[in-house]
Amino acid sequence: AGGTSGLYAFPRV
């Protein structure tokens, strides 16, 4: 999964 969530952002794995 990936995208933005609240104050966190992460790459799509």
UniProtKB/Swiss-Prot annotation:
It comes from the Eukaryota. The modification Valine amide is found at V13. GO terms for biological process: neuropeptide signaling pathway. GO terms for cellular component: extracellular region. It is found in: Secreted. Keywords: Amidation, Neuropeptide, Secreted. This is Periviscerokinin-1. The lineage of its organism: Eukaryota, Metazoa, Ecdysozoa, Arthropoda, Hexapoda.
